[in-house]
Design a protein with these regions (language model features):
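Short sequence/structural segments immediately N-terminal
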Residues: 1-234
Length: 234
């Protein structure tokens, strides 16, 4: 009797897999969402899936999860992160191979630590931190503020105005190879007058051609924001 029951279960599973294989992406996901959608648990995880980047590009639940024979038992995933993500996002694998990168290949963090693979409500499917700021400040809380003197690009454009999120050939994941090149993208031909943005007109005692004065952050050390100095000296 037990053997017959197991055979019936196997047949039912095979029939289910066959029927899923014939479904469109939207149809198969709709079947999953009959149970896996709504306010139970972490609603952000699945509630926005129908409007997510994955859903809009035809990625179904079955592309990442295997309900009957998963390679990974955790979340029934077909593969581990980041290899599962690299199936589609191959360009990011190249980014993580650069000399400076977030420790995703080493297993120090996962793609899903920053991105909500089921949608979420932030751009680029980023996860919202507890207090509503970007995914970055969950780890880099000391850069968050609020500060008495804010560095405007951080508030208006975010961390990616200076940093690349996945990997870079530049230290600190900067978008430019030298700090001064990054700074003069904004601070160029602007006089450093009181109440005005700081400019590239350095004091006469600071010869900008001297390597000693070419690293802006040697003096402007609190570049993310300061509570005591509008010039970010401290």
């Amino acid at each position: 009797e037990a053997t017959a029951l197991m055979n019936d279960t196997a047949k039912a599973a095979a029939a289910a897999m066959k029927s899923f294989s014939k479904m469109s992406s939207a149809e198969s996901s709709a079947t999953c969402l009959k149970c896996h959608e709504g306010s139970q648990g972490n609603a952000e995880e699945r509630f926005n899936y129908r409007r997510s980047e994955h859903a809009r590009h035809g990625v179904s639940c079955n592309d990442c999860h295997s309900s009957h024979a998963p390679k990974r038992t955790e979340f029934l995933l077909k593969n581990t992160e980041p290899n599962l993500c690299y199936t589609c996002h191959a360009e990011q694998k190249a980014s993580f191979s650069k000399p400076f990168h977030h420790k995703v290949p080493e297993g120090g963090m996962k793609c899903s630590d920053c991105h909500n693979q089921h949608g979420g409500f932030m751009g680029k499917s980023l996860r919202n931190s507890v207090n509503g700021d970007s995914a970055c400040v969950k780890c880099h809380a000391d850069k968050q503020g609020p500060f008495v003197f804010e560095h405007a690009p951080i508030k208006t454009e975010g961390c990616q105005s200076c940093h690349t999120p996945h990997g870079s050939t530049n230290p600190k994941l900067l978008t430019r190879n030298l700090v001064r090149f990054l700074c003069i993208e904004c601070h160029s031909n602007t006089p450093g007058l009181p109440g005005e943005p700081l400019g590239d007109q350095t004091p006469s005692s600071h010869d900008i051609n001297n390597p000693r004065y070419q690293n802006c952050t040697a003096c402007h050390i609190q570049i993310h924001g300061s509570n005591v100095d509008r010039r970010f000296f401290r």
